[in-house]
Regions:
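A short glycine-rich, Lys/Arg-flanked "PGG" loop and its adjoining helix->strand segment in the class I
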Residues: 154-167
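A conserved beta-strand element that flanks and buttresses the S-adenosyl-L-methionine
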Residues: 140-145
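Conserved beta-strand signature within the Rossmann-like core of class I S-adenosyl-L-methionine
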Residues: 167-173
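Conserved SAM-binding loop of SAM-dependent methyltransferases across substrates and taxa
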Residues: 81-92
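Conserved class I S-adenosyl-L-methionine
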Residues: 71-78
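A short acidic, Gly/Pro-enriched loop at the edge of an enzyme's catalytic core
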Residues: 130-139
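N-terminal auxiliary segments of SAM/dcSAM-dependent transferases
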Residues: 1-31
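Conserved SAM-binding loop
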Residues: 109-110
Length: 173
């Protein structure tokens, strides 16, 4: 019974789970992540790639797969420390919304957007994807789906479908 009860990934529980994993000292993540704090798989084109190069390869690959066009609206679900959203904004003329449930990641992302002078192009919010009611031309989510929980897959994909414009593209990793 307890396992069944705790497997529900309701909004409040999701925020608690994220806080438990990500709202801790950033010094820990600095020990093993690349300088942009990407916390998902990397794309090593060859064995000589450093972790940082492989993470940048991943971003470039994602941007290519999204087939981004100028002035599109992009949603990054589970934006983490904001790297993907910031790089999309920096490399395209798209407006990007990154959402996270982590207070630390939100503050870090907003600070990076300010440092990179991208505040007018990228926005970060402390928000659950289930609470959004906007349309996006592109939706990307890297390394977040594993936190959704099997019982919420249908809700997740229905929400992505609802948020995606009719001719939009979603990339879920």
């Amino acid at each position: 019974f307890y396992k069944t009860l705790t497997s529900f990934n309701f909004i409040k529980k999701s925020k608690q789970n994220v806080a438990h994993h990500y709202d801790i000292s950033e010094k820990l993540y600095d020990l093993f992540l690349d300088p942009k704090r990407q916390y998902s798989c990397a794309y090593f084109k060859d064995e000589k790639n450093t972790l940082e190069e492989a993470q940048n390869n991943k971003i470039d690959h994602i941007i290519k797969k999204l087939k981004l066009e100028n002035d599109q609206r992009v949603l990054d679900i589970g934006s983490g420390w904001g790297t993907l959203a910031l790089e999309i904004a920096k490399k395209t003329k798209c407006s990007v919304l990154g959402i996270t449930l982590s207070e630390n990641q939100l503050q870090y992302s907003k600070q990076k957007a300010k440092e990179m002078n991208l505040e007018n192009q990228v926005d970060f919010r402390l928000e659950d994807y289930r609470n959004l009611n906007e349309k996006f031309d592109r939706i990307v989510s890297v390394g977040m789906f594993e936190h959704v929980g099997k019982k919420f897959y249908k809700t997740y994909f229905n929400t992505v479908s609802k948020l995606l414009s009719q001719d939009g593209i979603a990339l879920i990793h």
